[in-house]
Amino acid sequence: MSSRIDRDVINALIAGHFADPFSVLGMHQTQAGLEVRALLPDATDVWVIEPKTGRKVGKLECLDARGFFCGVLPRRKNFFRYQLAVTWHGQQNLIDDPYRFGPLIQEMDAWLLSEGTHLRPYETLGAHADTMDGVTGTRFSVWAPNARRVSVVGQFNYWDGRRHPMRLRKESGIWELFIPGAHNGQLYKFELLDANGNLRIKADPYAFEAQMRPETASMICGLPEKVTPSEERQKANQFDAPISIYEVHLGSWRRHTDNNFWLSYRELADQLVPYAKWMGFTHLELLPVNEHPFDGSWGYQPTGLYAPTRRFGTRDDFRYFINAAHAAGLNVILDWVPGHFPSDEFSLAEFDGTHLYEHSDPREGYHQDWNTLIYNYGRREVSNYLVGNALYWMERFGIDALRVDAVASMIYRDYSRKEGEWIPNEFGGRENLEAIEFLRNTNRIIGEQVPGAVSMAEESTDFSGVTRPPETGGLGFWYKWNLGWMHDTLDYMKLDPVYRQYHHDKLTFGMLYNHTENFVLPLSHDEVVHGKKSILDRMPGDAWQKFANLRAYYGWMWAFPGKKLLFMGNEFAQGREWNHDASLDWHLLEGGDNWHHGVQRLVRDLNHTYRHHKALHELDFDAYGFEWLVVDDNERSVLIFVRRDKAGNEIIVASNFTPVPRHDYRFGINQPGRWREILNTDSMHYHGSNTGNGGVVHSDEIESHGRQHSLNLTLPPLATIWLMREGE
C-alpha cells in the first residue's frame, strides 16, 4: 500500500475539487513499486488485469469508502497495458482505465487553438469516437481555461462528476479525457467547478448533435464525412448566374394536418425540394437550423452552433435533405448567427465562471434588443470557434452559402444603444474593429478553403464596402441584402396609385447606389411579421387591385438588377402574416383556380424566364447591364428600362403603377426590330384583365426620348411587361 497519497488530495479528488487527476489516478512509478490508483465510487472490489492473458496481477485496496482504491503491483517494474476488474453491487465488470492514456491533443493543434488560427477546431475539440492503444471509446475536450475542475458526465457514468475528471492542458486552457466504451448515441455534458467555486453543467459548444428542447444534453456523434462541391453548384453562386432564393422556415412551411406537427427533414426532402424546383427557384435559404431552445426565436438564438436541430430529425436526416436539394439542382444557403447567443445557463454564458465567450462589460457584451450576449471577437479562441463553424457547415454538409444575420449589430458598438450605453473603440470611434476583422477573416477563409461557396450579409446601414475585398478595406462578403431597395419599393407600393406620382423616386433612387455593392433584393421573413402585414395585404385597393399591384411589383423586382429572394408563402400571396407555429395557408390553393394560383404561376414563370434570359441576370453588377428608357414619367407612374447581357441582347421592362391602361404609349429604344411580349403580369393566365400587345410589336422609325427608333405599346393597368427582341 502506498503512503504517498495525502488524505487531503483524496478528499479533494472525491469532492470534485482536484484539478490534476492524472497526477494521482492511473499507473505511477513510486518508491514502493509500480502502483495503480483508481476512483471508482460504489465499487467494492478492484483487481488489475493483464489483458493478453486475463490474469489478475494485483488487487487494489480501498483507501476510502467513497471509492478510492490503490495498490502496488508485485514483481512489476515497467508500465504495461492493463484493465480493471471492478465489482459493483455484486456484479463484476471489466473496464479500461481512462487514466492510463497519455495526452490527446497534439502540440501543433494545441498551439493553433491557442493562437486562434486552427481552421477546423471542431476536428479536435468536442467529442470524437476514437481507438487508442487498441481500446475503443470517445475522446472529449473542452476549452475552459479558468475552471478549477472539469469532468465529463453522461449516460456512461450515471452523470456523476466524480468518475471522469479531465486533464488540463495548461498551455491552451483545454481539458481532455479519453473515456473507453463511451460511444456514438450516448448523451453527455461537461461538469465544471468554475473560477468562483460554483458548479456548472454545460452542453458541449462543439457538439455535433444535441437533444431537442426542453432537454439540453449533447450527444456523441461522429464527425460527418466531407462533401465535395460540384462544378454546377459552384457556378450557381457566381455573380453572373441567375439566383432566385426561396427563403424557408422548416418548422412552418408545411405541417401534418392531423396534429400540426412538423415535417421531418426527410419529409421536407420529399415535399419542399421538388416544390422549390418546380417553382423554378435556384436556391433554398433556411432560417437557422442550429439547435436552439426557444421556438419563437426562429433559430436566431442558437445554443448548439454545430448541431442541426433535432426538431426535424437527426444529423444524418439533415444531410439527406441537403443531398436531395443538391440532386434537384438547388443550392442551399444557411442563415448563420455569429452575432450573439442566448444567456441560457446550460450554454456558453459565463462558461467557466468568467465571461469566456462574451464581453464582461454589458455595454459591449449584452444585446438589449434580444436579451442575448455578444461574442468577444477580440478573443482568438472565440473567433476561431465561429470561423471553424462556418467551414464546418460548408465542408461537412455541403452548405453552399451562409447568410450572416444582423451584421450591423456586430460592426457598430452603438447599435441600438443610447449615449452612455456603449464603449468607443481604441480610436474613439463607434466601429467594432474586432468584429470587422472577424468578418473579413471569415470571408477570406471561406474563399480560400471552400471554392465556389459564398457569404451574404444582412447589413442594414450604409457601411461602405460590405461586398468589397478585405484587402481594399471591405468586409469581403459576396452579396449584401438591399434593405434600402426593399423599404423604398414597399413604401411606394402601399400608396394609393393616385399618390404614387409624388413618390416616383422611391423606385428610381435604388439605381443611384446600385453598383456600390453586389445586391440581393430581399422580401424576407422580416417583412411579414410583427404587425407589418403580409406583402399582399400591404397593397392598396380592392381585392383585384391588391393582386394586380402585387403581380406588377414582382414583375418589377425580378427584372431589376440584383439577385432575388422571396420568403415562403409570398409566392402564392398568402393573405395573413407568417406564424412560425402553423403551416402556410396551403388551403388557399385548394378548389377552383383563383387569384392565389395566378400569383403562384406568375412567380414560377418569372423564375423560369429570368433563368432563361441572360440579360436579366448576367450583368446585375455592371452598369452596362441596365439603362433607363423612361425614368421621369411620374405623372403617369410609368417606368421603362432595359436589361442587357454581355453580348448586347436586350430585354425591355415596362411598368405601369396606376389602374389606368396607357394606350399608344410611345418611348424610344436602342434596337429597332420585332419585339415579343414574353411576360405580362396582367395576363389572364395570372387572373389579370388580359390587356396587352397581342404578342408581337414592331418598332417605328419615329424619334422619341432622344432615340431614333421607338415602340408604341399598350401598358396594362397595374402591370409589368417584359419584351424580347426577336429580329429585324
From Swiss-Prot:
Active site as annotated: 405 (nucleophile), 458 (proton donor)
Recorded catalytic activity of this chain's protein: Transfers a segment of a (1->4)-alpha-D-glucan chain to a primary hydroxy group in a similar glucan chain
An annotated GO BP: glycogen biosynthetic process
SUPFAM superfamilies, per database record: (Trans)glycosidases (SSF51445), E set domains (SSF81296), Glycosyl hydrolase domain (SSF51011)
Pfam families: Alpha-amylase (PF00128), Alpha-amylase_C (PF02806), CBM_48 (PF02922), GlgB_N (PF22019)
Gene Ontology cellular-component terms listed: cytosol
Record carries keyword GTP-binding: no
PANTHER family in alphabetical order: 1,4-ALPHA-GLUCAN-BRANCHING ENZYME
Protein name, per record: 1,4-alpha-glucan branching enzyme GlgB
